[in-house]
A protein has these predicted regions:
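A short, conserved structural fragment
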Residues: 71-80
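Short, positively charged loop/turn segments that connect secondary-structure elements
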Residues: 27-33, 45-63
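Short, cationic-aromatic polyanion-contact patches
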Residues: 81-88
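Residue-level detector of family-conserved "landmark" positions at structurally sensitive sites
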Residues: 51, 80-81
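A short acidic, leucine-rich amphipathic alpha-helix
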Residues: 39-41
Length: 88
């Protein structure tokens, strides 16, 4: 098995899941308030629960790169003041 290819495939699938969720969530609409990254993370089922040194709050930080990639593609935007994410 090529683990790098499989990892890339999984990242792309999760990126698609997050974008699909945001596209279909009224709270993340272009003119809506948006959601914090932790809320998006949990609503997409990506939270593994609470573990020592891996709390739910710590786990959600990896989604930052995913949201920044969607932002670089012109698909989402982050409100500067509220720090919430929404569809662009």
């Amino acid at each position: 098995m090529n683990y790098v290819s499989k990892g890339t495939e999984l990242r792309l699938a999760i990126k698609e899941l997050v974008f699909d969720y945001m596209s279909n969530s009224p709270v993340c609409g272009a003119y809506a308030d948006g959601l914090k990254q932790a809320e998006i993370f949990r609503q997409c089922g990506l939270d593994w629960g609470e573990y020592p040194n891996a709390t739910s709050s710590n786990q959600q930080y990896w989604i930052v790169a995913l949201l920044r990639e969607l932002e670089s593609e012109g698909k989402v935007q982050r409100d500067i003041d509220s720090k919430k994410w929404r569809i662009k």
